[in-house]
Regions:
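Divalent-cation
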Residues: 1-183
Length: 183
């Protein structure tokens, strides 16, 4: 996907909007599935979704996942500048080694992460925590600082430094994977 450069102050604002929504939903135990699209096109997952071309805002993200909203059970897809689709159905991971700890949102996040390069953030309504799925791995209970750093790197990514961004993300994910899992 071609993307023009996003000024750093705008990347910081977008990061704050998404982090604010995730933190609100975490605190209020509102389940959510937010997909940060990268290079892999996700058009196949828009078929049953509501197509959007909306500015990324904390309030709109929260309202999409509000329990009485008909879109709340599906995923929200963002690119680096806009919210592009809501109510998306994602492929579920079907690996038998996946713990029963994971619910449908976590399985959907893992499933999409196995077939795309997307970063998928999951808010657990049962535990009130945010997890990240990337390349078939799930990092549970992200700390606020980790989530904010990840979002800022995502929104501020530049084509000319994409390789560096991916190396940093890979290193960050290795740290998450190496930390002991907490039930």
């Amino acid at each position: 996907l071609w993307r023009h450069r996003i000024p750093l102050d705008e990347a910081e604002n977008l990061s704050r909007q998404v982090a604010g929504a995730l933190n609100y939903m975490k605190a209020h135990r509102i389940g959510a599935l937010v997909v940060l699209q990268q290079e892999t096109g996700l058009g196949d997952y828009w078929r049953t979704a509501v197509h959007l071309s909306a500015e990324i805002s904390q309030e709109l993200i929260i309202s999409i996942f509000w329990k009485d909203n008909p879109l709340h059970d599906g995923a929200l897809i963002l690119d680096r500048e806009r919210m592009t689709a809501a109510g998306c159905y994602l492929p579920l991971a079907d690996a038998p080694e996946i713990s029963r700890w994971y619910g449908t949102r976590h399985r959907a996040a893992l499933g999409l992460s196995e077939v795309s390069d997307a970063l998928i953030l999951v808010v657990s309504e049962e535990r009130g925590e945010v997890s990240l799925a990337y390349k078939g791995h799930l990092s549970k209970n992200l700390k606020d600082a980790q989530m904010e750093k990840l979002l800022f790197h995502y929104f501020s990514g530049r084509e000319t430094v994409r390789r560096t961004w991916r190396v940093r993300l890979h290193r960050l994910m290795q740290l998450f994977w190496e930390s002991p899992a907490q039930p």
